[in-house]
């Protein structure tokens, strides 16, 4: 999976226009190390709603390890502590082990998502999500809705601090320091 951790991403095209009262921003990225192109489109209306379309086209003949995740990461202020979502819960679950969880509406805190496994690793994921709200104590924040169910997680840890590659600097979860941020992951697909 190493190629996907640093795919050699390079912006190759960027343009924007205003159409039917919406700002439309298009960007194209070359992912040299994995022989792929990534296309992102942001449609922003005058009410503050943003529709994001993400598409990747890979060279079918490229010899690249399987992709472990396809989605987006958003680093938010730590104060975005409150989570509400409609999906599987209340405990963490992944696509290969989510049948022990119930579909429902859950209200949780980011601080409660991290589970201190002996060996540090990503955790706290939720699947089959229809909508996800990430807000601060005043109720201000963002809501994510997709055309198909998605996965999400929010932690006060960076991905790198939980999985820094083949040479782990920390051997136990208690050695990983909590970051002064909320790291939100919204994924279309993830290996579980």
Features from the language model and the residues they span:
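Beta-strand/loop-rich accessory regions of lumenal/periplasmic or secreted enzymes
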Residues: 1-192
